[in-house]
Amino acid sequence: MAKANTVRVRKKVKKSVSEGIAHVHASFNNTIITITDRQGNALSWATSGGAGFKGSRKSTPFAAQIAAEAAGKVAQEYGVKNLEVRIKGPGPGRDSSVRALNALGFKITSISDVTPIPHNGCRPPKKRRI
């Protein structure tokens, strides 16, 4: 009788990272939070839409807070303690996402605004008339 082939599966080892970078992309429609290590490899990410908010509720500070908590909890499993926060965009989730990360117990070492500013590049969208 032939011997059955057995496949050994190695247990996935989670890497231990003590310092990370939280990239907060706050647009007018959504907020995306990505937590990476120092080299830029993503450890965790979350969005307002992925946290269960749809439509105009995605662009609220509360939705950004929930998304930051979701990304932060996964990053804590990797052992992240210190965070450097880089905020990009003009959206309403800028401040609340940083507050949520601080409330989770992360030590925030620096907060920097990396919003791209054009040197008279593309024409901006026309002003809204309501």
UniProtKB/Swiss-Prot annotation:
Subunit structure: Part of the 30S ribosomal subunit. Interacts with proteins S7 and S18. Binds to IF-3.
Keywords, sorted A to Z: Ribonucleoprotein, Ribosomal protein, RNA-binding, rRNA-binding
Organism expressing this protein natively: Laribacter hongkongensis (strain HLHK9)
Family recorded in the similarity comment: Belongs to the universal ribosomal protein uS11 family.
GO terms, molecular function: rRNA binding; structural constituent of ribosome
GO cellular component entries: ribonucleoprotein complex; ribosome
Gene Ontology annotations of biological process type: translation
Full protein name: Small ribosomal subunit protein uS11
Taxonomic placement: Bacteria, Pseudomonadati, Pseudomonadota, Betaproteobacteria, Neisseriales
Pfam families (alphabetical): Ribosomal_S11 (PF00411)
Gene3D superfamilies for this protein: Ribosomal protein S11
Cystines in this chain: none
Role according to the record: Located on the platform of the 30S subunit, it bridges several disparate RNA helices of the 16S rRNA. Forms part of the Shine-Dalgarno cleft in the 70S ribosome.
